[in-house]
Amino acid sequence: MAIELGLSRITKLLEHLGNPQNSLRVLHIAGTNGKGSVCTYLSSVLQQKSYQIGKFTTPHLVHVTDSITINNKPIPLERYQNIRLQLEALNKSHSLKCTEFELLTCTAFKYFYDVQCQWCVIEVGLGGRLDATNVIPGANKACCGITKISLDHESFLGNTLSEISKEKAGIITEGVPFTVIDGTNEASVINVVKERCKALGSELSVTDSQLNGNMIDTNSWGCFDLAKLPLNGEYQIFNLRVAMGMLDYLQMNELIDITKNEVSTRLAKVDWPGRLYRMDYRFDKVSNRTVPILMDGAHNGSAAVELVKYLRKEYGNQPLTFVMAVTHGKNLEPLLQPLLRPIDQVILTRFNNVEGMPWIHATDPEEIKDFILTQGYTKEIVIENDLHQVLPSLAHVSDEQRRPIVVCGSLYLCGELLRIHNSHLRN
């Protein structure tokens, strides 16, 4: 199975399943970067004792079940397998030829329907207009959010920001009452979304594009001081503004009833590995030795630029060690050019096959090395194909001599390293 955009296959499969998506109350998120963060903010704030808040985000970080959660708890493996067996049988018996992502999306919808979730926070997989998640009727979407849009997946979405924006804005369908877009987007992007909203009668809110002293102003709760929240990276402020714009709309229209203190308390507890995530990485099963790392799933040009802003703020001009793997087919220049300097070291590796995504594989480290040398980014390059050996080799360097270690380039790399780390904790 590979990536095949379109709604015809999943529409037929869901019909055979009884159309569970038509009973869900949804918040739908599209964009290039920041979608997962917005989803995490939304699901965290919406959680109440009596509420079931479903969240569907991809790709998964450690296990495929991580993609489908209720109140941040992954779908039980047995439940996941039972729904998948049902879907695969329908897919085969009706010769639908659904993709892996379409099957995963249907699994989420069926689970959320069975559990009777009060809200479902749904992240677009790729693009928006023809993404499997867009099978949800517009009338079921309480509001939509669009994060920062930049060049990525050009072979599927188009080669210009305007083309890509039209695909992302496709989640705004007939019946969607309200949409929030990140105000730091290019004017051309915002204009595309404005035109889409105007054509379909969806009210549009453009978030503040300035930092403004790390404040977020809302109609429902007044101002929030973000200095009191654990937000790494200024771009997370802009992601949070999208989420807060959506929550503000829900509160103003009496679709939720949450106090300002509850919002602040829940935001303060938000945590997600793989996004500017600091950890002491345990690299073997026997000793308790660890090595400190910063892990970030930056995998395209705009994400790399934001990561660099954070690194310069934290480390100044200090030399860094990057541990990197890149998904095959990615444009290397936008990712590597902002990150690498002649004073930096790069350890190139590869991730293994990704569960549930057989079309995903890593770029050959030798290919990345040749590109880095040709571009003259740095000459300090090491290739280590065995992920189990990458971080132990750095752990033997003394604390005084060890450079800060940054793992980036792919969420699949982050996920596999976390699996190794977790397996060592269990042993």
From Swiss-Prot:
UniProt subcellular location: Cytoplasm
GO biological process: folic acid-containing compound biosynthetic process; one-carbon metabolic process
Chemical reaction(s) catalysed: 7,8-dihydropteroate + L-glutamate + ATP = 7,8-dihydrofolate + ADP + phosphate + H(+)
Coiled-coil ranges (or none): none
Binding of Mg(2+) 2, residues: H153
Binding sites annotated in the UniProt record for Mg(2+) 1: E123
UniProt-listed Gene3D superfamilies: Mur ligase, C-terminal domain (3.90.190.20), Mur-like, catalytic domain (3.40.1190.10)
Disulfide links within the chain: none
Keywords carried by this UniProt record: ATP-binding, Cytoplasm, Ligase, Magnesium, Metal-binding, Nucleotide-binding, One-carbon metabolism
Binding site for ATP: G34, K35, G36, S37, R275, D296
Entry EC number(s): 6.3.2.12
A Gene Ontology cellular-component term: cytosol
Family annotation (Pfam families): Mur_ligase_C
Pathway linked to the protein: Cofactor biosynthesis; tetrahydrofolylpolyglutamate biosynthesis
Keyword ATP-binding appears in the UniProt entry: yes
Signal peptide per UniProt: none
Single annotated GO MF: tetrahydrofolylpolyglutamate synthase activity
Family: Belongs to the folylpolyglutamate synthase family.
Function of the protein: Glutamate-adding enzyme which catalyzes the binding of the first glutamyl side chain to dihydropteroate. Leads to the de nove synthesis of tetrahydrofolate.
Note: Present with 2340 molecules/cell in log phase SD medium.
Protein name in UniProt: Dihydrofolate synthetase
Gene symbol of the encoding locus: FOL3
